């Protein structure tokens, strides 16, 4: 796990463990595309183990013991950051999943909502970059290199701007979709993700 900031560490040390009889709800979010992956519970020991090992570890209410996510399946959650809410009684863990999070073999324990599609697309593009399946347009882009990808973003940007001025809504939406897709590919080609851009937008909003 990456080093915690002093402020984050102080906030975690001041958690209110009394409200939930020693247990706090924990929301786990994909650090790269910000999709919610699962909900679990931690006691103080589980949090300490999570921070020390860098792998999300919960307290199982049914088994009454600590359990590290993926301890049997290997589908662990590597911790990137841990934050607390304003009441200090709920945790948000940003992590990078190694394999499906849900025991049903799904990426998330929650069904995908329309608003989460961009996050899912970002994850799919990252997968394409890693696996390079034959016949995939995304694979072709990555193999052509970052200059070609950047060129495509420029082309789609111009086409989107023109559609906004001289074409109808359907054309504007189509060009906007193409632009978003190629922009995510460009971010991935640079080793970045959609979540990085969103985090920057959030920091500017504060």
Curated annotation (Swiss-Prot):
Task: Provide the residue span(s) of the region labelled Phosphoribosyl-AMP cyclohydrolase.
Answer: 1-117
Localization terms from the record: Cytoplasm
- Return any one Pfam family short name: PRA-CH
Catalytic activity, EC = 3.5.4.19, 3.6.1.31
Q: Which reaction does it catalyse?
A: 1-(5-phospho-beta-D-ribosyl)-ATP + H2O = 1-(5-phospho-beta-D-ribosyl)-5'-AMP + diphosphate + H(+); 1-(5-phospho-beta-D-ribosyl)-5'-AMP + H2O = 1-(5-phospho-beta-D-ribosyl)-5-[(5-phospho-beta-D-ribosylamino)methylideneamino]imidazole-4-carboxamide
Q: What residue spans carry the region label Phosphoribosyl-ATP pyrophosphohydrolase?
A: 118-206
Write the record's keywords in alphabetical order, separated by commas. Amino-acid biosynthesis, ATP-binding, Cytoplasm, Histidine biosynthesis, Hydrolase, Multifunctional enzyme, Nucleotide-binding
* Gene3D superfamilies cross-referenced by the UniProt entry: MazG-like, Phosphoribosyl-AMP cyclohydrolase
Which top EC class is named for this enzyme in its record? Answer: hydrolase
Name the major location: cytoplasm
Q: Name one GO biological process term.
A: L-histidine biosynthetic process
Instruction: Tell me the GO molecular function terms.
Output: ATP binding; phosphoribosyl-AMP cyclohydrolase activity; phosphoribosyl-ATP diphosphatase activity
Task: Give the superkingdom in one word.
Answer: Bacteria
Query: Which GO CC terms are listed, alphabetically?
Result: cytoplasm
Write down the InterPro entries for this protein, in alphabetical order: His_synth_HisIE (IPR023019), HisE (IPR008179), PRib-ATP_PPHydrolase-like (IPR021130), PRib_AMP_CycHydrolase_dom (IPR002496), PRib_AMP_CycHydrolase_sf (IPR038019)
**What pathway annotation does it carry?**
Amino-acid biosynthesis; L-histidine biosynthesis; L-histidine from 5-phospho-alpha-D-ribose 1-diphosphate: step 2/9; Amino-acid biosynthesis; L-histidine biosynthesis; L-histidine from 5-phospho-alpha-D-ribose 1-diphosphate: step 3/9
The cross-references to HAMAP family, in alphabetical order and at most eight, read: HisE (MF_01020), HisIE (MF_01019)
Similarity remark: In the N-terminal section; belongs to the PRA-CH family. In the C-terminal section; belongs to the PRA-PH family.
**What is the official name of this protein in its record?**
Histidine biosynthesis bifunctional protein HisIE
Q: What is the originating organism of this protein? A: Xanthomonas campestris pv. campestris (strain ATCC 33913 / DSM 3586 / NCPPB 528 / LMG 568 / P 25)
């Amino acid at each position: 796990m990456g080093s915690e900031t002093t402020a984050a560490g102080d906030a975690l040390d001041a958690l209110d463990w009394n409200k939930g009889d020693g247990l706090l709800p924990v929301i786990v979010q994909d650090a790269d595309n910000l999709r919610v992956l699962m909900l679990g519970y931690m006691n103080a020991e589980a949090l300490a183990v999570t921070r020390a090992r860098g792998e999300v570890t919960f307290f199982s209410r049914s088994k009454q013991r600590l359990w590290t996510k993926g301890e049997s399946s290997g589908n662990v959650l590597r911790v990137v950051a841990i934050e607390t809410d304003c009441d200090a009684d709920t945790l948000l863990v940003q992590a990078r999943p190694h394999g499906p999070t849900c025991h049903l073999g799904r990426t998330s324990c929650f069904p995908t909502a329309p608003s989460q599609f961009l996050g899912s697309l970002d994850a799919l593009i990252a997968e394409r970059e890693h696996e390079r399946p034959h016949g995939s347009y995304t694979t072709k882009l990555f193999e052509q290199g970052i200059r070609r990808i950047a060129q495509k973003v420029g082309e789609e940007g111009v086409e989107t701007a023109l559609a906004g001025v001289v074409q109808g809504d359907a054309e504007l939406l189509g060009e906007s979709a193409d632009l978003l897709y190629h922009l995510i590919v460009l971010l991935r080609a640079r080793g970045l993700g959609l979540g990085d851009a969103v985090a920057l937008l959030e920091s500017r909003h504060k």
